[in-house]
Amino acid sequence: MTASELFDYYRTTGALTEEDCLDYISWVQDAPDVTKSAMAVSGLTLSLLENNWDRRKVELLATSANSSLTTGMVTERAIIGLLLVMIQYDTEVRTDQTLIDALQESLLSNPGLAFSALCAITRTTQVKGVEEYNKSMAKELQPLLSEQPSEKLYDVFQHHQQEIERITRLHLDQNFSFFKDAYQTPFFRERAANWFIPWSDTALQNINEDDREHVQKLLKVWIMCDSDKYALGSMYSMLRSTLQERIPLDGLASNKREYVSVDGYVQQMYRFFRLSSFTQAKPFDIVTQLREKVVYRWVVVGRQAQEAISELLQGV
């Protein structure tokens, strides 16, 4: 099967049998094509987030998240998927001690990555916070705007402005409105798997040769996740006249912040559940509503990590 077919299979398959699990584990340990493994992990993750609880699927995610068995992109996707599933199915997980032990073992195999993934998920949920604050600000300011300027009007505006600035300082998706349009191309309407394909330079072959050099430079910008690259690449000819105006390429490209790949994959997940017509699930809304569940006393690695996450969440 191709990578996309593997994604579709694990996303749409029903409850797994014990034989299915043994086949999957054997396949992962044989270290096949990394892209296929990563797409299979994404399919498993979506199957759980979109449908119903399946303990065996969670166990397979835990196996894929264990860095003693997998590496690189496969491990990263599995850890992020595992954390999202644990948040969504908090009750089911916390009442199953055997499963808790298995999940804990997988996350402890790469504590730094698990912590980074948890922080990335937490930061990403703040994107919705910007929208909510904008609506709240409009609702509170509207009646005040019909009156004479007052101290109250200034205070309300200042409060909301500070809140929005605080949220955006967390390095959130500041170009989200731009990419919302870019994701309307046929590539993303054809199949759900296209939202999760790892970026490949071969995709540039569809771009006019005169534009290719500039697009290659643009696609090295750290802030862009893989699906953004496909979105921008497939829509480049239509955006040509306004591209430099909408995305300050030089400013972004010179940013010294180290790229964290888990941030990119969380962005891809967020975009899929936010913009895709393939799903009605809203796992990131659950994360936002149940924020206290992000700080798992049996997930975070050691007191220092737990304190760091608690500090991150203060005031949210």
Place the predicted regions along the sequence by residue.
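Alpha-helical solenoid scaffolds in large eukaryotic transport, assembly, and signaling factors
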Residues: M1-T75, G81-T95, E105, T125-G129
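Long alpha-helical HEAT/HEAT-like repeat alpha-solenoid scaffolds in very large eukaryotic proteins
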Residues: T2-A3, V85-T91, T95-E163
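Charge-rich, solvent-exposed alpha-helical interaction surfaces
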Residues: E5-Y9, A102, E140, V156, ...
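Surface-exposed polar/charged interaction patches
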Residues: Y9-L16, W27, A31, S67, ...
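Conserved aromatic-histidine-acidic binding/catalytic patches
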Residues: L49, A65, T70, H160, ...
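C-terminal regulatory domains involved in ligand/effector binding and gene-expression control
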Residues: E132, E163, I167-E190, N194-W195, ...
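The transition from N-terminal targeting/processing segments to the mature protein
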Residues: Y183, F187, P198, L204-D210
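Alpha-solenoid helical-repeat scaffolds
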Residues: I207-V316
